[in-house]
């Protein structure tokens, strides 16, 4: 299998990839063990990505000799070897390769796939495709024996993020929007919450995530994610309202974090996780017209733009989804 050994890593230059790898390892250290290769259902085969943490899940979909692959891990040589040996042992050929989004831990294996299977060069699909790739449109259908896959555009984690609905199983391949365990990083919180509602409305029972175990109750998981994001919005608004009541006109992000989480968290958690997340919440609230900012000493200071009770209530869609979960 040595001739199948490859390796490629697409790196976002704004990201400290070493720190992110360490973060993934720490976050996933106590998660359930996932087999390198597992036939989850007669239609769904999962191959583990061999990248940091528990890895990125690659899915091979269908029941015949030609099947569809979703995501390609991060380009680790071990992944390429595992894919080649698995497909060979099962007499499987790939007809399409679908990428949920551009992040390197999902697209990094593409060069190895093309090297091993040159016929796939014109069969790599992604929303906002790179050169040589094919576009994916919202609602586009892909078919192989035993599987009908419908693509939906659900941005937020990234602008190009797609999920894929496996119609025969009433299941969704959720990419990074909904994880098997934990919660996802978000590029645009407003778009992300709109996308979660769109995902919820597809009425899929099962979720195959790009990271972690299978999600057995996808509507509940989505509802909890929406509720958690809304609660953070409410906490931010309440923190800004409290500061105004104490004659403090505006707060820096670090002060908003302190009001919500206290002062006891370690500095890496504060600066690498909490402050970026609260910054995203504030930017969404600004887009909603609920907060504003002023510049002081060259830095943004945030304040509540309105003091209406309805701003502290969950949106109707979230209330309905949470109520459905309770019932």
Where are these regions (language model features)?
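Glycine/proline-rich low-complexity segments that form flexible loops, beta-turns, and polyproline
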Residues: 14-18, 129-132, 157
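Histidine-centered divalent metal-coordination motifs
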Residues: 100-106, 157, 211, 281
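Active-site HxH/HxHxD metal-binding segment of metal-dependent hydrolases
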Residues: 6-7, 51-55, 67, 73-148, ...
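Residue-level signal for inorganic ion chemistry
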Residues: 43, 83, 211, 236, ...
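Metallo-beta-lactamase
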Residues: 67, 74-76, 148-239
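Conserved beta-strand hairpin/beta-sheet module of binuclear metal-dependent hydrolase folds
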Residues: 30-90, 163-177
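Residue-level signal for the nucleotide or nucleotide-sugar donor/cofactor binding architecture
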Residues: 108, 187, 273
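C-terminal regulatory/interaction regions
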Residues: 2-21, 26, 241-327
